[in-house]
Amino acid sequence: MTIKVGINGFGRIGRMVFQALCDDGLLGNEIDVVAVVDMNTDARYFAYQMKYDSVHGKFKHSVSTTKSKPSVAKDDTLVVNGHRILCVKAQRNPADLPWGKLGVEYVIESTGLFTVKSAAEGHLRGGARKVVISAPASGGAKTFVMGVNHNNYNPREQHVVSNASCTTNCLAPLVHVLVKEGFGISTGLMTTVHSYTATQKTVDGVSVKDWRGGRAAALNIIPSTTGAAKAVGMVIPSTQGKLTGMAFRVPTADVSVVDLTFIATRDTSIKEIDAALKRASKTYMKNILGYTDEELVSADFISDSRSSIYDSKATLQNNLPNERRFFKIVSWYDNEWGYSHRVVDLVRHMAARDRAAKL
């Protein structure tokens, strides 16, 4: 039986999630995307947005449009690889979306608007069974990072969950390996050098709450905030309060990189850390954590579906005499593509656990 999914918000992440489903051969086989929701319902425009992408290139699948019924004025249905997806008008209150009528079980909440648990619960009142927020969430929604704490999902108690942020999905696997392999973290500082996103300005504009954030994204390196490091403490409790960080938004359209400087809880070496991360990337963190020892730059990671790709050539150790605990490690991530694949993975994981619990 296929998983019935609705995507609320067919913007950057919503479309990338949909494309990930298609590229992985899941659409119509394991997952049935019943509907996508956005401010307009013009399927022809949605089709155009999917066909052509300035970063990830042309859509690799067949896409056309049709009408859901003869009485509608414009095409309101996408047809992708022969599968029909209804385009639904966005609502101020998610409870007003017709999830129950459409048979949708799992909603991917990717508008960026309903990130508080109580607001996202509107989807449940609309007839959905579960909600995955594709952003950091507040108000008591449990946060999951695939490969790190996804097995803590409780089908009977957790109905609205968060897939964390793209940066947390890059950082948490690194920290998970460091903790699991016994290196530990006494304290650490993280910086993400992050590509600009849709919330930024193309030219200098008004940004009353974040003055620097109002400057032209493609012309500046912009210091910013991130909750990614602190969020790691939510998924790896032993690191609670030990990590904090900041961001630099930079003039690239996609791919970001995490720089983690930390003090281990025991003496170790670059060689030992490198070996542990390489081993993890081939075993228990495969397809989540990657490893590279090549001379790569950001463009080389565009459309990489892994959450975090550790750069072994960038690892540093403090050069003070007898210092064996102070290190810097670096990891790349496609902040769009890798993250979108983890959203899909989380939905699949939840559905499998829900079926096992006979929900």
Swiss-Prot record:
Residues with site note (Activates thiol group during catalysis): H194
Superkingdom assignment: Eukaryota
PANTHER family listed in its UniProt record: GLYCERALDEHYDE 3-PHOSPHATE DEHYDROGENASE, GLYCERALDEHYDE-3-PHOSPHATE DEHYDROGENASE-RELATED
Protein name: Glyceraldehyde-3-phosphate dehydrogenase, glycosomal
Keywords associated with the record: Glycolysis, Glycosome, NAD, Oxidoreductase, Peroxisome
GO biological process: glucose metabolic process; glycolytic process
Pathway named in the protein's UniProt entry: Carbohydrate degradation; glycolysis; pyruvate from D-glyceraldehyde 3-phosphate: step 1/5
Note: There are two identical genes that code for glycosomal GAPDH.
Positions with a binding annotation for NAD(+): R12, I13, D38, Q91, N335
Organism name: Trypanosoma brucei brucei
Active site: C166
EC number annotated for this UniProt entry: 1.2.1.12
Motif Microbody targeting signal in this chain: 357-359
GO molecular function: glyceraldehyde-3-phosphate dehydrogenase (NAD+) (phosphorylating) activity; NAD binding; NADP binding
Subunit organization: Homotetramer.
Compartments where found: Glycosome
